[in-house]
Amino acid sequence: MFFEIALIGTTASGKTYIANTLAREFDAVVLSLDSLCVYKEINIASAKPSQDDLASIKYFGVNLLSVNEHFNVELFIREYQKAKEFALARNLPLIIVGGTGFYLKTMIDGLSEKTLESKSSLNNDEIYTLLLNIDPNYKIEKNDTYRLKKWLGIYEQTREIPSEFLKRTQKTGVLKDIEIYELSWDKEILKKRIQTRTKEMLDNGLLDEAKILFSKFDHKLKALNSIGLKECKEYLDGEISFKELENLITIHTTQLAKRQRTFNKKFQSKALEFDKALAILRMKFSIEK
């Protein structure tokens, strides 16, 4: 029987493990909402599902683009529509999973009218200062270059307060009344999980993946400045030691987890402790099916 749920949580919270386990047991379709898993060439830095997982589970939202190709949330909306059509036609459950909460939020709330990203030479600090003066209710992290440029683009092209423009032009979302489950962890335990995952990524060839990526593509590309790869670039350039590389990836990933936890408060979700999550969701899937 078709039904859909969203599974959210911070990086290293075990979302993919839970989703894959349920997908295998209940023949579910999985839509990944991850800003790095879309890239064909990034496998370790993205913590992408394994080749075995991708071969045995019907996945959408993975391995869609090359690193030098640009995408936005509309890509995930199209992938959702494909995934839902596939699941509906076969009467299968659909699991939406991923750490990029912004994409899920947009799919629920709807897109606003298109505007171009600003080509201004202003840096993040300058745009952020402008935002605080003009549109203090619009919440963007100071280091979120894409959304800051998008905000400035709206202001430049419309001369409206961007938060008001977005509200006025917003369209209906594609996701309605979806149950959202959030995996929860004690902060210190999650930090240890992040440390362990960082070590595993390095042991599994993260540096080799980074070398190949930086030899083939412009290091200024957004995807190559993601956590895990930007630190590898510093190490490969001789700017930091291997120990510093491991520590920096862990620190930056922990900071990301904190931002994700804050963003996820925007959702009306049901908190699930990781150790109990699988049993609770198995029961739900059994009842729905």
Curated annotation (Swiss-Prot):
Residues 34-37 are annotated as: Interaction with substrate tRNA. Belongs to the IPP transferase family. The record marks T100 as: Interaction with substrate tRNA. This is tRNA dimethylallyltransferase. Keywords: ATP-binding, Magnesium, Nucleotide-binding, Transferase, tRNA processing. It catalyses: adenosine(37) in tRNA + dimethylallyl diphosphate = N(6)-dimethylallyladenosine(37) in tRNA + diphosphate. Its EC number is 2.5.1.75. It is an enzyme of class 2 (transferase). ATP binds at G9, T10, T11, A12, S13, G14, K15, T16. Substrate binds at T11, A12, S13, G14, K15, T16. GO terms for molecular function: ATP binding; tRNA dimethylallyltransferase activity. InterPro entries: Dimethylallyltransferase (IPR039657), IPT (IPR018022), P-loop_NTPase (IPR027417). The keyword Nucleotide-binding applies. Monomer. Catalyzes the transfer of a dimethylallyl group onto the adenine at position 37 in tRNAs that read codons beginning with uridine, leading to the formation of N6-(dimethylallyl)adenosine (i(6)A). It comes from the Bacteria. GO terms for biological process: tRNA modification. Its cofactor is Mg(2+). The keyword Magnesium applies. The gene is miaA.
